[in-house]
């Protein structure tokens, strides 16, 4: 019925938010690691 439809939408948007946040966190972590690697390559300290 109407309630289950609304509930599914809520669950979907909740999951989407979690995935988006997790993706952002993972992306930032990868970016930081990449910057560190590039930095040490420039300095020749890898």
From Swiss-Prot:
Protein name per UniProt: Esculentin-1SEb
Organism: Lithobates sevosus (Dusky gopher frog)
Keywords: Amphibian defense peptide, Antibiotic, Antimicrobial, Disulfide bond, Inflammatory response, Mast cell degranulation, Secreted
GO CC annotation: extracellular region
Protein role: Mast cell degranulating peptide. Causes histamine release from rat peritoneal mast cells in vitro. Has antibacterial activity against the Gram-negative bacterium E.coli K12 and Gram-positive bacterium M.luteus NCT C2665.
Localization annotation: Secreted
Tissues with expression: Expressed by the skin glands.
Keyword Secreted found: yes
Disulphide bridges, residue numbers: 40-46
Family stated for the protein in its record: Belongs to the frog skin active peptide (FSAP) family. Esculentin subfamily.
Gene Ontology BP, a term: positive regulation of mast cell degranulation
């Amino acid at each position: 019925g109407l309630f289950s439809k609304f509930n599914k939408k809520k669950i979907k948007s909740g999951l989407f938010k979690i995935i988006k946040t997790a993706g952002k966190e993972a992306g930032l972590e990868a970016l930081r690691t990449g910057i560190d690697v590039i930095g040490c390559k420039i300095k020749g300290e890898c």
